[in-house]
Amino acid sequence: MKTLFLGVTLGLAAALSFTLEEEDITGTWYVKAMVVDKDFPEDRRPRKVSPVKVTALGGGNLEATFTFMREDRCIQKKILMRKTEEPGKFSAYGGRKLIYLQELPGTDDYVFYCKDQRRGGLRYMGKLVGRNPNTNLEALEEFKKLVQHKGLSEEDIFMPLQTGSCVLEH
C-alpha cells in the first residue's frame, strides 16, 4: 500500500511539474492586482507597475525582469528564480524568497505569490498577472479567494496603475 501511495504521489508530482513547464509561463505578464501583508509599509507599495517579462533559462529556472522609476531614474530589476523540487515553487536570493506560480482555473491569469524572509520576519506579497492589461473579474474573484486562503486580507488588495517599461539610461 505504501509503495502504491508513493508511486501515485511521485507520478502526480511529475505530472504537475510537467504541466507547469508545458504551459508557457514565459513572455510578458501585466500586473492587474497586488496584495501585501499588513507589515508592508504603505509608502513602499508600488503605485505604478511595468509589465513583467519571464524568460526560461534552462533546467526549469526562470528569470523575471521588470523596470521601475526611482528618483527620476529608470531601474531594471532581474530576479533569478531557481526551480525547486516542488512543482510551481521557485527560490530566489539564496533561498530568502520563495515564489509560487499558480494558474487560476478557467482563466489565462496566474498568481505570483512570494514569501520573503527579512531580518527574522516574513513578508508576503501576491500579484494577479495576465497576458493582457485588462482585468478579468473572474480571475480577480479567484485572486481574492486565494488571498484569504493564504491568510491575507482582501482589504489589502490594491490595483496599481499599469505603465509601460521605462527606458534605461546607458
Swiss-Prot record:
One GO CC term on file: extracellular space
GO biological process: glucose homeostasis; sensory perception of chemical stimulus; sensory perception of smell
Signal peptide positions on this chain: 1-15
A Pfam family that the UniProt record links to this protein: Lipocalin
Functional note: Binds and transports small hydrophobic volatile molecules with a higher affinity for aldehydes and large fatty acids, including undecanal, palmitic acid, efficient aldehydes, benzenic aldehydes, heterocyclic aldehydes and aliphatic acids.
Classification via PANTHER family: LIPOCALIN, ODORANT-BINDING PROTEIN 2A-RELATED
Name this protein carries in UniProt: Odorant-binding protein 2a
Organism listed in the record: Homo sapiens
